[in-house]
């Protein structure tokens, strides 16, 4: 039963490849659109491992992944419609402004909680990326109301 399914799948793929190449031979198709289904499939397969993105720090940088000996190492050019990476300088006090807005004022910590505050404020993802500033404000208010910080 499995062999029959494999033959059906194989025959349908071959049929699709043949019909797509014959369809593209018509006179109505422009030269720029003249790609067979096989070329499109190879392009998609070739782009997936090569277009992995690695995020380091604040900016994302595209880097080619290391390929094993079994993977295809074909490097295809990127399409022209890919957007360039924009580097926007950030205001250093922007984080403080957002957190003051979300916490409805400045958050004050006693000396016992300063180390916890600095760990959260400077070393977590929530307080280092602008998209997570609301989470950071929530974490800091929970820390300010925790029993450890309210004991003094």
From Swiss-Prot:
Disulfide bonds join 113-149, 127-136. One of its GO terms (biological process) is positive regulation of ERK5 cascade. Disruption phenotype: Fishes show reduced iridophores in eyes and operculum, with no detectable phenotype in the trunk. Fishes lacking both alkal1 and alkal2b show a complete loss of eye iridophores. Fishes lacking alkal1, alkal2a and alkal2b are embryonic lethal and display total loss of iridophores. InterPro entries: ALKL1/2 (IPR029364). Keywords: Cell membrane, Cytokine, Disulfide bond, Membrane, Secreted, Signal. GO terms for cellular component: extracellular space; plasma membrane. It comes from the Eukaryota. It is found in: Secreted; Cell membrane. Residues 1-23 form the signal peptide. Pfam families: ALKL1_2 (PF15129). GO terms for molecular function: cytokine activity; receptor signaling protein tyrosine kinase activator activity; receptor tyrosine kinase binding. Expressed at low level in the notochord and iridophore stripes, the eye and the swim bladder. Its main location: secreted. Belongs to the ALKAL family. Cytokine that acts as a physiological ligand for receptor tyrosine kinases LTK and ALK. Required for iridophore development in the adult eye by acting as a receptor for LTK. This is ALK and LTK ligand 1. It comes from Danio rerio. The gene is alkal1.
């Amino acid at each position: 039963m499995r062999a029959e399914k494999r033959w059906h799948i194989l025959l349908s793929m071959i049929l699709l490849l043949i019909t797509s190449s014959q369809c593209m031979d018509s006179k109505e198709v422009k030269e720029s659109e003249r790609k067979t289904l096989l070329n499109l499939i190879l392009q998609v397969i070739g782009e997936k491992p090569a277009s992995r993105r690695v995020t380091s720090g604040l900016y994302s940088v595209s880097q080619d992944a290391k390929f094993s000996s079994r993977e295809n190492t074909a490097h295809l050019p990127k399409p022209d419609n890919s957007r360039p990476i924009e580097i926007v300088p950030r205001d250093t006090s922007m984080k403080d402004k957002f957190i003051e807005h979300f916490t409805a004022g400045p958050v004050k910590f006693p000396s016992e909680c300063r180390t916890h505050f600095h760990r959260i404020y400077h070393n977590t993802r929530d307080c280092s990326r602008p998209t997570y500033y609301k989470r950071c404000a929530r974490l800091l208010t929970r820390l300010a109301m925790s029993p450890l910080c309210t004991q003094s």
